[in-house]
Every structure is written in structure tokens, then in C-alpha cells.
Amino acid sequence: MGHKKTVSIIGAGNVGEHIASLLVLKGAVNIRLFDLPKKDGEKLYAHVKGKALDMLQMACALGIDTDISGFVVDQNGNGYEALEGSDIVVITAGFPRKPGMSRDDLLGINISIMNTISEQIKKYAKNSIVIVVTNPVDIMTYAVYKLLGCNRKRVIGMAGVLDSSRFRTFISLELNVSPKDVHAYVIGGHGDEMVPLAGVSNVGGIPISTLIDEKKIKELVERTRFGGGEIVDYMGTSAYHAPAASVVEMIESVALNAKRVLTCSVLLDEEASKYYEAENLCVGVPVKLGENGVEKIVKVPMTDFERDLWMKSVASVKKNIAIADEFVSKYI
């Protein structure tokens, strides 16, 4: 067996833990899991170490040869030495929005967390590919890119892979076909103004417009745009199985140099900026992912209606980027 890549996951909450678990089951990479200690009353628990040990024993029970370790860190950046040698770093850590907290408050807190983590990445894993999962993901991806001061190809946000999988799911359910044969992309910001591209969506090469009537397509598009909220309404918390699986798709494309074309939040290059009419921001577009990160930004065709929705999505992201820049400027 060849050299296994090392993936470090910062944040062992629902999404981070499930990313690690899926990677363990695949057995293709070595895993390092980082998190703060968990407080219960007066006692602090090194829960990240327990989760890693539990997953290692799971691998043993299933006969999977893997390596996973847990590391306790603190809010001041201590404990990150094990990042050294990481090929890929996944950031899921972040602060959830609390009652009475404005979106600007949340941006400020999470950008502060991104700064602490970025400092440790620069110190111990400066050549790694960084995948950002923390929400709002387009803004956090932009912040990490600015804080790291690295090549734009190395910082990638997880957004469209998840949104596209939701769109594909709803199409496959509507037509009662395997999702393997459903090809669909969702671009734009990872929020209510995302843009599911019905115009290029197809099943086995057949456009969905010939298989599903226009009214139903609009319903599937709307369900996709609010797909995350639908799960919150059912569970009382955000999704984590599908987001984790989406991150694993990205990790595998990088770690195995698979060169998959996946929708990710990235900083557009000059050529793509002209086509997509979006400069100096991170937003979801199809990209080719390989061992060096973003190898190519793909120009996906849009109908006039989809282009209008795209421009609205870009405007929304741009507005939040301007707010984020004020917070980021405090650290660089």
C-alpha cells in the first residue's frame, strides 16, 4: 500500500465526528481529530480522545487498518503541534448563533476562531490543503484565505457538494431512479439564495425538463434551497450526516488526486471572475479538485433566469464579505 495522506479535523462536534467516522470506514487516510475539552459541571473531559479511541476500536472490529488519534486544544492555540505533517486540514470548529446575537456578532466571533486556527495552520501545516466547513461558509472560507495569505487554490469551502446532493436526492425521489444517474449542480452562496441549475440537470444524459414538468421542477428547486431548514425543523438541529459525507467526497478527491468536478466555495481567478461576474469573494462554483487543491474552475452554462438568480446570490455574499473584511483587518 502507498503512503497514506494525513487529514486533520479541527472540531469534533457532530459534523467533525462524522467526517472522522466515515474516513475511518474507508481506511484510505490517517486521521487526527482536535477539539476543546468538554465541560460537565466542574469537570473537564478530553472527549476528543475518547471519540478517537472509540473509532479506532470500531475499525478493529470491522477489520479496517487505520490510524486515528485525538488531541485536546485550547482557545489560545495550544495543543496544535500534531497538525505538523498534515496534508489536508478540515475546519468545522465554530460558535453557534445564540438568541439575541446578531449575524455581525456571530461573524466576529467565528472569524476570531478562524484566526486562532489559521495561525496554527501557518505554524505547523503551511503547505496543507484547507477545507472550511464552518458557517457562514462562503464568508469563513474568504476569511481563512485572507488570514493564511496563501495561494487561493489551497482554501476550499464545503457548500455546493452538499446542496447538489440534496438537489440530486429530490430529483431521484421524484423520478424513482438511482441518484447515481442524476447529475445536477447547485452554485452560488450557501444559503437561501443558492442557485440550483435545473437547466443543466439530467438523468442519464436526459435533461430533467423532458422528464419533470416545469411546476414540479420549481418545487424541487425551492425544496433544495431550504433543504437545510427542513432538516432543522424535523430534528431541532442542523444536519450532519450529509455534510460530513460531502466533506469526505472533497477529501478523497484531494487525497487520492481523483480530479473530481465538485461545487465548492472558492476565490475565483481572473478568467472565472469575468465569466461569473464576481470578484474578490468566495462563492460556490464547479471546480476540479486534485492533490494541489483547485486545479480548474469550470464555467457552467446558465439560463437568463439562472444568471439573474446567480447575480442576486453574488450580491448577498459580497455584502457579507464587506462586513467580514472589517473583522479580518484586525488580524492582518
From Swiss-Prot:
Broad enzyme group: oxidoreductase
InterPro entries: L-lactate/malate_DH, Lactate/malate_DH_C, Lactate/malate_DH_N, Lactate_DH/Glyco_Ohase_4_C, Malate_DH_type3, NAD(P)-bd_dom_sf
EC number: 1.1.1.37
Organism superkingdom: Bacteria
Gene Ontology BP, a term: lactate metabolic process
Disulfide bonds: none
Residues binding NAD(+): G11, A12, G13, N14, V15, G16, D35, N110, V133, T134, N135
Keyword line: NAD, Oxidoreductase, Tricarboxylic acid cycle
CDD domains: LDH-like_MDH
Oxidoreductase keyword on record: yes
One GO molecular-function entry: L-lactate dehydrogenase activity
Role description: Catalyzes the reversible oxidation of malate to oxaloacetate.
Family: Belongs to the LDH/MDH superfamily. MDH type 3 family.
Name the UniProt record assigns to this protein: Malate dehydrogenase
Gene: mdh
